[in-house]
Amino acid sequence: MRFSRIPPIFANVVRQTHYRNYANGVIKPREFNKVMVANRGEIAIRVFRALTELNKTSVAIYAEQDKNSMHRLKADEAYLVGKGLPPVAAYLTIDQIIETALKHNIDAIHPGYGFLSERSDFAAACQNAGIVFIGPSPDVMARMGDKVAARQAAIEAGVQVVPGTPGPITTADEAVEFAKQYGTPIILKAAYGGGGRGIRRVDKLEEVEEAFRRSYSEAQAAFGDGSLFVEKFVERPRHIEVQLLGDHHGNIVHLYERDCSVQRRHQKVVEIAPAPALPEGVREKILADALRLARHVGYQNAGTVEFLVDQKGNYYFIEVNARLQVEHTVTEEITGVDLVQAQIRIAEGKSLDDLKLSQETIQTTGSAIQCRVTTEDPAKGFQPDSGRIEVFRSGEGMGIRLDSASAFAGSVISPHYDSLMVKVIASARNHPNAAAKMIRALKKFRIRGVKTNIPFLLNVLRQPSFLDASVDTYFIDEHPELFQFKPSQNRAQKLLNYLGEVKVNGPTTPLATDLKPAVVSPPIPYIPAGAKPPTGLRDVLVQRGPTEFAKEVRSRPGCMITDTTFRDAHQSLLATRVRTYDMAAISPFVAQSFNGLFSLENWGGATFDVSMRFLHECPWERLQTLRKLIPNIPFQCLLRGANAMGYSNYPDNVIYKFCELAVKNGMDVFRVFDSLNYLPNLLVGMEAVGKAGGVVEAAIAYTGDVTDKSRDKYDLKYYLNLADQLVKAQAHILSIKDMAGVLKPEAAKLLIGALRDKFPDIPIHVHTHDTSGAGVAAMLECAKAGADVVDAAVDSMSGMTSQPSMGAIVASLQGTKHDTGLSLDDISKYSAYWESTRQLYAPFECATTMKSGNADVYKHEIPGGQYTNLQFQAFSLGLGPQFDEVKRMYREANLVLGDIIKVTPSSKIVGDLAQFMVQNNLTRETLVDRADDLSFPKSVVDFMQGNVGQPPYGFPEPLRTKVLRGKPKVDGRPGENAKPVDLDAVKVELEEKHGRTLSEEDVMSYSMFPTVFDEFETFRQQYGPVDKLPTRLFLTGLEIAEEVDVEIESGKTLAIQLLAEGKLNKRGEREVFFDLNGQMRSIFVVDKEASKEIVTRPRALPGVRGHIGAPMPGDVLELKIKEGDKVTKKQPLFVLSAMKMEMVIDSPIAGTVKAIHAPQGTKCSAGDLVVEVEP
């Protein structure tokens, strides 16, 4: 008799009669035709699959918020319930569910788990409507689904129980009285539901009342009834549960037990069947007691009896789950019994014998483990996450079963429901093998867009005590190492985010001109595969140390070359924008062909902060990368004495630590200079380098003209005296740093000749710029006068404000006693590569405004790199024709400051003052006259205070007094009395701020450039290793249909193609479509220009401790403060509710509530600003 064949007018009467007779055992029920699942998500789909296998029509219900959920689509039919109701409430509308079932001729309803699955009133409503409830009868549910009633039944059946309240309680006072009688710890549990909802352990009497309120609220929200019961807490138990099946003929069997001891907040995380290492005697008694209890109450259908087993083997009944369990899967895997099919067929009236299920035939084979993959962030206390799944790839293969619902790319994880995404079940011959399969499967998962607990699950599975099966419910609490995660790299998706950002919003690195990077592939000279670099000068340094290294340099015939192409050349010509990507590409050729170089300058100066600020790459990683590719040539960097890589003075311990780390990472030669030639600053840098084991190249910044007798400040005597002090300070190499290129050939001959005569044993190294056009001639004179090393840039990166041409110097010295030993053929190939590569940096090309050098540098003495910047600024402001005036004013500013040494940061001081004078139409005389009333640039004030150091000939007066107006002065070395930085404390603070383990190098970058580092770190976490992208794509992105291969590491290459860019949606976003490794992916990018019109909720700013945001998406359930309130640190501010979990958010600081941005009831996204506290 099928219900569907009965005319609708009589259907309800027949159904009621049928069900009553069925319940009383009078008639044998017939087969179902249509079965509804009153649930959602993966359990609904699990039941649908069973119905399909049994050739039955599956029917889904769904809430409005679940309109796009997969369970609605998987069913044969689906109907909306709870229209206009909150998301969870829709699945609790018994009347609407029954009405829908009657309307569509539903024969039976399967409740799944959660929601109404343990509500006896729902089972009764089904019965009254003539619909079969697939589960226990209403009276059994009322008794067993109610945990207190189930406890009483256990006592009646002779099963030992844990001390607890005799019935549900609804007031905190009752909980307090129980705690007083039995002592703490106690546990509060929801009386009408499970899944960890409404459960709290309480260790102190004074905490009972607040815990009761929270548990009651959670239970009310999850199950529609906040009643709780209280039990004495059993210490260190294992959580063992027994799976039961009972028919309507009085037969009952067990399907053995499961171990659910791995729990968090009383919610199961990992389940195992059968329970490993459970003593056989205990197992048999537990199974027998579970059957005894089930027979005592006349249990029907599927259910679970749960026990706590203590360390001595004593066990206590805790509850019955009168429904199917989430972890039923592991029992199915070890017994081969389809529990859901069995449920349905038992509800149809079949006996266990009909199903060929008897205790004797039910056996276990092997072991099974289930892991619940959830959208929770274990690094943040398992905060639920929600949002769009951008990427989903599962782990599969032999021994792996996946039960899921919303696990696919494009799926939106709602904040309204449970965070379970997919259940992964691994089965094998034994527990360790099952764990190995599970580890393999979880490692293959790729889920992007939402956080998951997979890293935590992997740590659990690898933990020795888990593998030894010696875990109890304290397992997670007692193993903090489970929360030590290796951050997910997520490189591919982050790079897509970057390319999408560039496509929608344009370059992330500001482009200096309208020129576009050329579409070129720079030619890389051929190198035989596996060829090892020949021996170079670095081998001497590594084997014999800095002192012997210096002797070796001095003893070698000829003049050696330092190649500045990797640093100062592009700093001068291309705004310091050359990326590691392009340096690394040519590095193997450099190692093979230029082993005769003295050094390769590739680090320091402006490159350090620019690499983070504009190129979004780590300067330390650049050093590490190049060191691996060029092991044979010494690396050279520019060290600003007490400024290190920065622009201000740092405490000494920062300088020393920086040098230590630089040497550790592969730096060899440190050109130590000071922007004022201030000896105390120089000595700090020299001592730090020497202590670290680096080569100390003490540099004297050159200015003026030693051949001009009228310029008596920086004469030959000045340089010889300073050089004498540096040599006495144990410099390994003496350097002349001509940063403006004002060292004329004749001056070079005089100065270098005098230094060589006075210091015959120390190597001399000369650096210059070719701004005047006389750089090659000057370097040739240096070589002839006794210089051991001169600086040059490869031909296509030389000239103008860069260094002189390497090819020109090498060719000019060939065949002489100063021969460099370098090959012009190799230089030609090297130059061809950089000529092509330079076109990629067209947006930063100085040649757009600068067409040649200019000998007027001998007057204004502007350093090479600064000259380029000043000229570009002038042209960009429409002052190109007045650039000569800008240069003239630079000279005036220098003179008014006392004719100082000009190199970063002192050159910036002169530049700032020059612009200030131009803007205010000042001359040298009027500046001094009006100084009392002018607001000078900060850099000028700092200089006058002595914060940069002491000029060789003192500060200009009365200008200094007028500028300072009583401000304090520093008379000695600025950093001498600076408090050491607690680098360990900084590391802890940074790791807390950025949420990952940071290196010593990261801490050092922050110590010198705190804001730049923070922004770089935030950028990299969002967009990944953009340094792996080819330069043109990094700067301007992909064109539609363009493809690119991106090697993210050796043997791992991403194939990326940009497919399309979507239209603007109502959230101000555009969807950008990519093909990644043959699979389509899409991301949503906020159109920053269009979104200016869209009102959004303010965001909590990272690093601002008074900004307290929503740590997860959810609703503001309760505000515990109001504006103007004084709050203490860790005082509760508000309660957030998400995924049926409540979280109390505390204040991280003491202060006053400045503003509440999200009133009670507000729906928040993760990171939305809720409360603002003013310290």
Swiss-Prot record:
Residues 1099-1174 form the Biotinyl-binding domain. A divalent metal cation binds at D568, K737, H767, H769. Its EC number is 6.4.1.1. Its main location: cytoplasm. Pathway: Carbohydrate biosynthesis; gluconeogenesis. One of its GO terms (biological process) is gluconeogenesis. SUPFAM superfamilies: Aldolase (SSF51569), Glutathione synthetase ATP-binding domain-like (SSF56059), post-HMGL domain-like (SSF89000), PreATP-grasp domain (SSF52440), Rudiment single hybrid motif (SSF51246), Single hybrid motif (SSF51230). NCBIfam families: PRK09282.1, PRK12999.1, pyruv_carbox. This is Pyruvate carboxylase 1. The gene is pyc-1.
